[in-house]
Amino acid sequence: MRNIILHQREERDRLLSLPYINRQTIYPVDVLLQSPMIKLITGPRRVGKSVFALLALKNTNFAYLNFDDNQLLTNWNEDVVMQTLNDVYPDFQYLLLDEVQNLPNWDLWVTTLYRRGYNLIITGSNARMLSQEMATVLTGRYIPIAMYPFSLPETLQWYDIDPTNIPTEKHAKVLSLQDDYLRLGGYPEIVKTRALAQSYLSTLYDSILLKDVAKRHKIRNTESLYNLAGYLLANFCNLITANDITTEFGLKSVTTTQKFLNYLHEPYLFFYLQRFNNKLKVMKKAARKVYVVDNGFVSTTAFNLSDNLGRLLENQVFIELIRKGYDTENTLFYYRSRNDKEVDFVTRKGVKVERLIQVCYDLTSEKTRRREIDALIEVAGELKCQTLQIISYQHKEIIEEKGFTIQVIPFMEWLHE
């Protein structure tokens, strides 16, 4: 066990020596470290959860266990592990548990450590396991921190560009990076080397489906799983229903389909947005819109991306809203009016509708412009909301119509609101 933990310490120190950028989270790092509560860092594979935790702890005395290491799991003995940690990391202040969900009964062990007074930082890649089990055993004793692929500002930082102060001579470079980002996404490895996008994302996609879904849930018929995931990718930003999918793929039942949809959400691959309605039963029955965690996964399929720029922008806005702390159960929805006009995003604060957001890549067509404005105004009347936005790719203006003010704001500017 000592050799395993020493080897992991070497890996920890190697990772700490590499160049990184500081990631954006809704909590400042110093505030997180001062809290005795468990810091739970979640998100999809390969987005930098471990690196974020390591950087946060860089100037502290911390112990490290990586549960992606089969040797650690095979030789697991709780008492021996804790004794060895104390030998290898004398008087450590924090304990970082990386991908802890791989340890059987991890939640019980973490609970024990917490009650003994250890200051814990945990990372994991499974939404259901982590949120449900933590909520069950440690309600109110942990701080959730969600990590996603790089945002556009983080991508610019990687290229040594301050997104809040872009010099004139770098405008062309920034526009090029923004175009790349919209199509290829923000996975850290892809941001560093765009030429790897196709092969890297295809491999990562397979890994998520096979390891995080098929293996975890003992799914033998991986063809059905791949077909369903492919269908969701093809229909990103569109409405889906479990009934339609069941019929389309000849699945056993709507219950089976719903189960598969949930499995594909657990590793943060797909998200499902509900239609806003004050009646919960009506809301749960309505079709949902599907979004994917990173636009790069769309680029690994055979779609004609030039036809999808509007959807790619909408998908990215969705991810940014999630990154800002909105969630698809309580605070973020789409809406259709009584006349079937759709608004892409409705945000809610408490019981009050906070904001209506349309996403439109290009407003130069009068027909498109009219459609977006009319939908916003009609829905604003129904939901009694005065804060209206259209997020465009580059266009900016203020529209005054029928007593409403609509802010048209470029995507890059909206990110800094």
Language-model features: locations:
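Conserved lysine of the Walker
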Residues: K49
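Hydrophobic positions on the alpha1 helix immediately C-terminal to the Walker A/P-loop
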Residues: F52, A56
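Domain-level recognition of nuclease-like catalytic cores that cleave nucleotide substrates
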Residues: Y393-E417
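Short glycine-rich substrate-engagement loop in P-loop NTPases that contacts/grips substrate
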Residues: A63-F92
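Accessory nucleic acid-recognition modules appended to NTPase machines
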Residues: A195-V353
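Hydrophobic anchor at the beta1->P-loop junction of P-loop NTPases
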Residues: I41
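Interdomain motor-coupling "hinge/lid" segment immediately C-terminal to the ATP-binding subdomain
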Residues: R2-R14, A127, E133-L239
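A short, basic N-terminal segment
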Residues: M1-L32
